[in-house]
Amino acid sequence: IFLGDPLQLKQVSQGIHPQGTGSSVLEHLLGEAPTIPEDRGIFLERSYRMHPDVCSFISEIVYAGRLYSDDSAARRTTSSGTGIRFVPVEHEGNRTASDEEVAEIAKLIARLVQGTFTDSDGSTRQLRETDFMVVAPYNAQVRRLRAGLPEGVRVGTVDKFQGQQAPIVFFSMATSSGEDAPRNLAFLFSRDRLNVAISRAQCLAYLVCS
């Protein structure tokens, strides 16, 4: 029995291995299929984390439209709403860190924390700093975010937060342009990386970038 999600981030390997051995057993089973075929396995099609307004995007771009939200996830909301929002921030020449994005996220959190979160059981409470998760692809941006955001806000790389969740998530991309990307655009715009970052959100996800 093999369990897992090959469409999220892979384990980092420090070793050198022959070509093809970096793929998991599940990736070999999938082949070119976007999700596991019915004759090869069982696709767990229900998300207990993401509100439908978040889940529908992830389902479409990653899971071939097969993923949907459980009713309990659909009952969660914030006073600022649900879904995925794009926050453009102007900056130039940034490679792995952006003070401009840190300032914008700090401003948004200061406003959002004044609102409320309603859980799946119908209970409503004031949002607090620990209800916010800020994800970045680079350690340099993580350090800037930790220095510039309120204590209690969870900040880390995409890899660190795999498996975790929060009512509101920010994905700070930091890089100003493709020419400024220190690795390559395939890393920055990796489908698996975007999947993990956005799908941490129970209610609201903000994509913050140049």
Where would I find each of the regions flagged by the language model?
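Conserved helicase motor core of SF1/SF2 NTP-dependent helicases
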Residues: 1-210
